[in-house]
Amino acid sequence: MNEEYIEKFKEAKEKILRAQNLTELEEVKRVYLGKQGFLTQILRSIGKMPQEERAKWGRLANEWKEELESLYENKEKELKYLTLQKKLEEEKIDITLPGRRKILGRIHPINQVIEEIVMVFKEMGFQVVYGPELETDYYNFTALNIPMDHPVRESHDSFYIDKEHLLRTQTSPVQIRVMENKKPPLRVVAPGKCYRRDIPDATHSPMFHQIEGLVVDTDVTFAELKGVLTIFAHRLFGKDRKVYFIPSYFPFTEPSAEMYVECGVCKGAGCKACGYSGVLEILGCGMVHPQVFRIVGIDPEKYTGFAFGMGPDRIAMQIYGIDDIRLFYENDVRFLKQF
């Protein structure tokens, strides 16, 4: 029996040291150090041994147990380390490889055009200003010399919040606010959103963008207006695009004109984008009406100026060759990701 226990001890040591993985090691522990292991058997059999051998085998069993547990712990640490190293090697990441490319958002094509237009005017010395989208009737109509009985004041043309407030129908109110708060000389552009009760079609939208421009100084002439806007058109569309100024009427300018450019979609042949006319109106303009100057407290005998308002939505149609303005507002990613 004594020889058998000694062989079992040697066998346990050898199997612990030869274990190839944690599963094998755990099995060795169960067989030799578990409840049914040989050390437990020794401790249980001590009571049956002769009196003189009990102390010897009790001490020896405890020494073997401590030695085997120490071997087990060291082997367990070794195998855990090797297992971790193997896992790290198998899951190794090559940090020199390029990462997965993220899909980034893009600036909306209309905002791109607005930025481009504003940059052209900034290079000509204009300052960028902004105004509220919720306006009073006074700034949106009265201060711009628009008569009380003008159709544009009707609720079927404008989005009224109450009797005195509405969503602005144009960015022109910004020029009134600027002239009230700053003294000439003035040279500003005001981009922003506008709202009208338009039925959506190829060239109309109830929400659209506009860029207002204003120049006030002594001896400003209509020739300067034409010069500035022609330079702008050639910078934006190219010098080969024909530009036309046609007499028009606006309550806040006198004389007034509309500026047309040759349609970039059909090259003047006529299409849906230009109403089959071959040209497209891109802005209205004119010399600031003396009455508007009087309303804001500027002497019309001393100062003159010109104003203009353009729709970057329609200009974007020309630049990108789009024949339906609704495409810009339908949020179709397939369309928008092209820009």
From Swiss-Prot:
GO biological process: one example: phenylalanyl-tRNA aminoacylation
Superkingdom assignment: Bacteria
Keywords: Aminoacyl-tRNA synthetase, ATP-binding, Cytoplasm, Ligase, Magnesium, Metal-binding, Nucleotide-binding, Protein biosynthesis
Record carries keyword Transferase: no
A GO MF term: magnesium ion binding
Annotated EC: 6.1.1.20
InterPro entries reported for this sequence: aa-tRNA-synth_II (IPR006195), aa-tRNA-synth_II/BPL/LPL (IPR045864), Phe-tRNA-synth_IIc_asu (IPR004529), Phe-tRNA_ligase_II_N (IPR004188), Phe_tRNA_ligase_alpha1_bac (IPR022911), Phenylalanyl-tRNA_Synthase (IPR002319), tRNA-bd_arm (IPR010978)
Cofactor note as given: Binds 2 magnesium ions per tetramer.
CDD domains found in the cross-reference section: PheRS_alpha_core
Chief location: cytoplasm
Reaction(s) the record says it catalyses: tRNA(Phe) + L-phenylalanine + ATP = L-phenylalanyl-tRNA(Phe) + AMP + diphosphate + H(+)
Compartments reported by the entry: Cytoplasm
Keyword Aminoacyl-tRNA synthetase belongs to the record: yes
Entry GO terms, CC: cytoplasm
Catalytic class of the enzyme: ligase
Binding site for Mg(2+): 254
Cofactor(s) recorded in Swiss-Prot or TrEMBL: Mg(2+)
SUPFAM superfamilies named in the record: Class II aaRS and biotin synthetases, tRNA-binding arm
Subunit structure: Tetramer of two alpha and two beta subunits.
Alphabetized HAMAP family for the sequence: Phe_tRNA_synth_alpha1 (MF_00281)
Family affiliation: Belongs to the class-II aminoacyl-tRNA synthetase family. Phe-tRNA synthetase alpha subunit type 1 subfamily.
Protein name: Phenylalanine--tRNA ligase alpha subunit
Organism of this sequence: Dictyoglomus turgidum (strain DSM 6724 / Z-1310)
Organism lineage string: Bacteria, Pseudomonadati, Dictyoglomota, Dictyoglomia, Dictyoglomales
Encoding gene per record: pheS
